[in-house]
């Protein structure tokens, strides 16, 4: 799970403190999801920290700046891997929110996560430095860079096969 959770009544300064703890150079910033008790309300990015003077960070809450959870790219955890690849490639960040069957946030998925799943399924283990480098750049590990193109060609091939069967 690579997202953080903050209660909606927390001051923006808390968001700033979370960001200082993130090791962005290693894997990119975590998403910050906002809740009120057991209810998911949305998410917040760093824009309020850039737009507001530091003096306002203790007066405004993260809940004042939340965005709807539905605005994050997402995929259900039961989706086949090819759908996850399409969702990741369609997202601006190269990452999607994974939703449980109940529609609740369960984690995130990026290119490296997909690459690890494919390699594991194939029984291939790459050295840790190679995996770390791919994670740092949010890229597929070597040998899997063609996954998006392969997945993109799948619907075209299946549609063409359907047309050929219909014409015979």
Placement of each model-derived feature along the sequence:
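C-terminal structural cap/anchor segments
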Residues: 16, 30-31, 40, 45, ...
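Short, low-complexity N-terminal regulatory "tails/caps" that precede and couple sensory modules
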Residues: 151, 161, 165-168
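Soluble N-terminal domains of membrane-associated systems
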Residues: 46-51, 63, 125, 166-168
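The conserved cystathionine-beta-synthase
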Residues: 5-29, 34-36, 53, 73-101, ...
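Short hydrophobic beta-strand motif reused across regulatory alpha/beta modules
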Residues: 41-49, 106-115
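Intracellular, membrane-proximal regulatory regions of polytopic membrane proteins
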Residues: 11, 33-35, 44-50, 57, ...
């Amino acid at each position: 799970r690579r997202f953080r959770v903050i209660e909606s009544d927390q001051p923006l300064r808390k968001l700033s403190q979370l960001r200082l703890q993130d090791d962005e150079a290693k894997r990119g910033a975590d998403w910050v999801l906002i809740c009120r008790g057991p209810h998911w309300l949305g998410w917040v990015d760093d824009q309020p920290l850039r737009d507001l003077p530091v003096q306002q960070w203790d007066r405004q809450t993260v809940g004042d700046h939340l965005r709807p959870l539905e605005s994050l790219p997402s995929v259900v955890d039961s989706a086949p891997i090819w759908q996850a690849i399409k969702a990741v490639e369609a997202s601006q960040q190269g990452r999607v929110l994974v939703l449980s069957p109940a529609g609740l946030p369960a984690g995130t998925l990026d290119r490296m996560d997909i690459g690890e799943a494919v390699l594991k399924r194939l029984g291939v283990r790459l050295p840790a430095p190679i995996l770390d480098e791919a994670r740092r750049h949010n890229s597929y590990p070597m040998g899997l860079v063609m996954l998006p193109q392969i997945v993109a060609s799948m619907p075209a091939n299946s549609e063409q096969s359907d047309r050929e069967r219909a014409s015979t």
